[in-house]
Amino acid sequence: MLFRAVLLCAALALSHAANPCCSNPCQNRGECMSIGFDQYKCDCTRTGFYGENCTTPEFLTRIKLLLKPTPNTVHYILTHFKGVWNIVNNIPFLRNSIMRYVLTSRSHLIDSPPTYNVHYGYKSWEAFSNLSYYTRALPPVADDCPTPMGVKGNKELPDSKEVLEKVLLRREFIPDPQGTNMMFAFFAQHFTHQFFKTDQKRGPGFTRGLGHGVDLNHVYGETLDRQHKLRLFQDGKLKYQVIGGEVYPPTVKDTQVDMIYPPHVPEHLRFAVGQEVFGLVPGLMMYATIWLREHNRVCDILKQEHPEWDDERLFQTSRLILIGETIKIVIEDYVQHLSGYHFKLKFDPELLFNQQFQYQNRIASEFNTLYHWHPLLPDTFNIEDQEYTFKQFLYNNSILLEHGLAHFVESFTRQIAGRVAGGRNVPIAVQAVAKASIDQSREMKYQSLNEYRKRFSLKPYTSFEELTGEKEMAAELKALYHDIDAMELYPALLVEKPRPDAIFGETMVELGAPFSLKGLMGNPICSPQYWKPSTFGGEVGFRIINTASIQSLICNNVKGCPFASFNVQDPQPTKTATINASASHSRLDDINPTVLIKRRSTEL
């Protein structure tokens, strides 16, 4: 009888044994498949490795590994030797060859077609075809794994509030040594909200941004109904209003477009744009206004060039031109600034025409998560000689009208943003958003930091001190997580030691760049079928794209052509400004900004 009981217990134990793939035994992007309840097999197909766990390199792979420099070495070369890079930048053949390598080496790290999502940790038609899911770079940790990170770490992750308070929250503002400014910060927020549109009703693994890329739905609206409400249906233009001799977005009343505004916001300040959340802060409405003006400006140019075209063709072609302008500005101004490279990046779709490249994209939830750059935000916003708190800034379009776009551009170009990596720089005002980012990552069962580093060809960290580059935060993290292999992705990105004089650490760049460049160059307008003058109304439209920059965008649409850049030209200690005691029309004294932002989206 006792023997039977022992056998029964053993059988029950085996039936509840952990999934053998929980330990992530397959290396170098090999795929683990369970066989029975306690065996697994690694599929090493086309990885360049073989063996039980895909750890033995093939001959050509071994040579590539010997010759390939580390990401930090590449970064060092690209951010030093300025004289050499000045020569390279002026030799088209060399510049094109290097840019082609940058694009292909980065974008080939992204699976296309997509593979996994929050509910499918294996290949399935649902994971491929259902656009309402974010895709995944790594499958979720299986439900039957013994710990949240597979087999490493404790059975429970540390309290997210404790993680936030000990290593993420700001003690004092840490400016970005790379000189990133608020013009950049609000561009990032405005630009990414066309594809980071989490469906909060369905959960963090789902998106409402079904275009999965740069389609400018934040300008034109996600649905055809919203687009039609925003359109003038005359000369291809969008609706607008004129205030003080300048063009601004129309109101909610005039368009009947749904926007998110608290009840106290006056009717005349409820501007209506493509993204319903852009009334949150005037910095977002600034860019919404600039792109509205740009669309209507391009329509005027096309109308003059093609008087025979109807409203629909003028609208659709102008949209394609603005998509092209956006991609060019993002690569040549935005990514250029973030990289810190002396090599001059170039937007030229023809560089990929003879390469293996798929013109499609699917936004990954990890890309959404890593883009939560809340440390960029300052403690206050300086416009002209006035200083606004978070409370005064929220849902207060009156500030935009009071100061005007020119002063906004000038002020945000001068105001330095915060450093993202290095820890302890998340503003208290958005702590609820940062906490939600941790909680939602857990809900989506992200794998550990080191698993993501391996996925993107980086060496895993061996200690918390190696991660942070110092001892004090490393000790806090060790007490919280115990094992470096159990370190969560999102907090790790914010506490990772920054590269020298840089805004980010290694992991943020090496994970983010492939997602970014694949999404940009995978746009249909970059394909051989689209990338030709006739797509954009002829040479005139093509020239608008090929000469676009953040400075030209501002000059063409803001009075006085104020200087615009994504970095502070001469970083100075922040001067004391006059605190603006008035919230103007906003009446926000009784509003908690962290609650408001959390209710809207963790992406804001």
From Swiss-Prot:
Residues 18-55 form the EGF-like domain. It comes from the Eukaryota. Binds 1 heme b (iron(II)-protoporphyrin IX) group per subunit. Its main location: membrane. Induction: By cytokines and mitogens. Expressed throughout the forebrain in discrete populations of neurons and is enriched in the cortex and hippocampus. Keywords: Acetylation, Dioxygenase, Disulfide bond, Endoplasmic reticulum, Fatty acid biosynthesis, Fatty acid metabolism, Glycoprotein, Heme, Iron, Lipid biosynthesis, Lipid metabolism, Membrane, Metal-binding, Microsome, Nucleus, Oxidoreductase, Peroxidase, Prostaglandin biosynthesis, Prostaglandin metabolism, S-nitrosylation, Signal. Residues 1-17 form the signal peptide. The keyword Chloroplast does not apply. GO terms for cellular component: caveola; cytoplasm; endoplasmic reticulum; endoplasmic reticulum membrane; neuron projection; nuclear inner membrane; nuclear outer membrane; protein-containing complex. S-nitrosylation by NOS2 (iNOS) activates enzyme activity. S-nitrosylation may take place on different Cys residues in addition to Cys-526. Acetylated at Ser-565 by SPHK1. During neuroinflammation, acetylation by SPHK1 promotes neuronal secretion of specialized preresolving mediators (SPMs), especially 15-R-lipoxin A4, which results in an increase of phagocytic microglia. It is an enzyme of class 1 (oxidoreductase). GO terms for biological process: angiogenesis; bone mineralization; brown fat cell differentiation; cellular response to ATP; cellular response to fluid shear stress; cellular response to heat; cellular response to homocysteine; cellular response to hypoxia. Its EC number is 1.14.99.1. The record marks 516 as: Aspirin-acetylated serine. InterPro entries: EGF-like_dom, Haem_peroxidase_animal, Haem_peroxidase_sf, Haem_peroxidase_sf_animal, Oxylipin_biosynth_metab. Homodimer. Dual cyclooxygenase and peroxidase in the biosynthesis pathway of prostanoids, a class of C20 oxylipins mainly derived from arachidonate ((5Z,8Z,11Z,14Z)-eicosatetraenoate, AA, C20:4(n-6)), with a particular role in the inflammatory response. The cyclooxygenase activity oxygenates AA to the hydroperoxy endoperoxide prostaglandin G2 (PGG2), and the peroxidase activity reduces PGG2 to the hydroxy endoperoxide prostaglandin H2 (PGH2), the precursor of all 2-series prostaglandins and thromboxanes. Belongs to the prostaglandin G/H synthase family. This is Prostaglandin G/H synthase 2.
